[in-house]
Curated annotation (Swiss-Prot):
Subcellular location: Plastid, Chloroplast
PROSITE patterns noted in UniProt: RIBOSOMAL_S18 (PS00057)
UniProt keyword annotations, A-Z: Chloroplast, Plastid, Ribonucleoprotein, Ribosomal protein, RNA-binding, rRNA-binding
Transmembrane segments: none
Similarity comment: Belongs to the bacterial ribosomal protein bS18 family.
Assembly notes: Part of the 30S ribosomal subunit.
NCBIfam families, A to Z: S18
GO biological process terms on file: translation
Transcription recorded as keyword: no
Organism name: Adiantum capillus-veneris
Name the record gives this protein: Small ribosomal subunit protein bS18c
A GO molecular-function descriptor: structural constituent of ribosome
Main location: plastid
Length: 75
């Protein structure tokens, strides 16, 4: 029997310590948005709950200011 499906190795964090979560940092925010324009879940992003909250509010602010699209319909 397998012990578990999860690997025991440590994954690298998806946000480096020198990166700040800001609505103006669109290159960082695009990593956390799916192809359809949805905010990815915390488990997919490997973020803490505090980081996920900050990312979500930054993405929403960037959408309102037209820095990020609400939906990504580029075909």
């Amino acid at each position: 029997m397998n012990k578990s499906r999860h690997s025991s190795r440590r994954r690298s964090p998806s946000i480096r310590s020198d990166e700040t979560i800001d609505y103006k940092n669109t290159s960082l925010l695009r990593r956390f948005v799916s192809e359809q324009g949805k905010i990815l879940s915390r488990r997919m992003n490997r973020l803490t709950s505090k980081q996920q909250r900050l990312i979500a509010t930054a993405i929403k602010r960037a959408r309102i200011l037209a820095l990020l699209p609400f939906s990504n319909n580029e075909s």
